[in-house]
Design a protein with these regions (language model features):
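Membrane-embedded alpha-helical bundles that constitute the cytochrome b-like, heme-associated redox core
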Residues: 1-190
Length: 190
C-alpha cells in the first residue's frame, strides 16, 4: 500500500503539467516535518524486515530454485505462477529499491526539477522503466495473495479479484509511465 501512496505522491508532478509546484509543495511538507529524513530510513528498515520475513519461504539454493520451477510447471496453476513472479520481483526490488532510496535520500531536498534532471540524464530513465512494473506486479500480486490467504478472496470470487488486481496494476503502471514522461519531457532541470 505504501508503494501505491508513493506513486500517487510522485505523480503529483502531473497536476501542473510538469511545473512541479504541487510535487515540490508535498516534498517540502515531508521534509519540513522531518518525515523524509526519518521516514525514509524507517521505510528502508521496514522493506528489509519484509524481505527477511518473506525470504523464509523463498528458495535460495540453485537446487531448490530448479525444484520450485519444475513444481510450478507441473502444477500449471495461476496462483503458483503469481508466487513465482512475486518472488523474482522481490529480489529485483530489494536491490533497485535500495539504489533508488540511497540516491534520493542522499540528495535532499526532493524537488521535481532534481527528479527530472535525474531521469533526463544517464541511465535513470531505463532504471525506472524496469523498476516500475516490478514494483506494481509485486504489490498487486501481494494484495491479491493476502486476500486469498486470509479468506477474503474465495474460489467463487477469485476470478473477479484476479481481474481487479490486473486492472489496478495496469492503472498504476500507466500512472507511472505518464509520470516518467512528464519528468523526461516537461520538467525543466535546475
Amino acid at each position: 500500500m505504501f508503494m501505491w501512496a508513493h506513486m500517487i505522491l510522485v505523480a503529483s508532478v502531473n497536476l501542473d503539467l510538469g511545473g512541479g509546484r504541487v510535487m515540490n509543495w508535498i516534498a517540502h511538507f515531508f521534509e519540513a516535518t522531518y518525515m523524509a529524513q526519518i521516514g525514509g530510513p524507517m521505510i528502508a528498515l521496514v522493506m528489509l524486515a519484509h524481505f527477511v520475513l518473506a525470504a523464509r519461504k523463498l528458495p535460495f539454493k540453485a537446487r531448490e530454485q530448479k525444484e520450485m520451477w519444475r513444481h510450478s510447471v507441473r502444477l500449471n496453476h495461476l496462483d503458483t505462477w503469481l508466487w513465482v513472479i512475486q518472488a523474482v520481483t522481490a529480489f529485483i526490488i530489494l536491490i533497485m529499491g535500495c539504489i533508488h532510496m540511497w540516491t534520493v535520500l542522499t540528495d535532499l531536498p526532493i524537488t521535481a526539477q532534481k527528479s527530472g534532471a535525474r531521469i533526463q540524464g544517464g541511465w535513470w530513465l531505463l532504471f525506472y522503466i524496469f523498476l516500475l512494473p516490478m514494483i506494481e506486479l509485486h504489490v498487486g500480486i501481494g494484495a491479491y495473495r493476502i486476500g486469498v490467504k486470509w479468506g477474503w478472496i474465495k474460489r467463487s470470487n477469485r476470478q473477479f479479484f484476479h481481474g481487479l488486481e490486473n486492472k489496478i496494476t495496469l492503472i498504476f503502471i500507466t500512472i507511472g509511465v505518464i509520470t516518467l514522461f512528464t519528468f523526461y519531457v516537461l520538467v525543466k532541470p535546475m
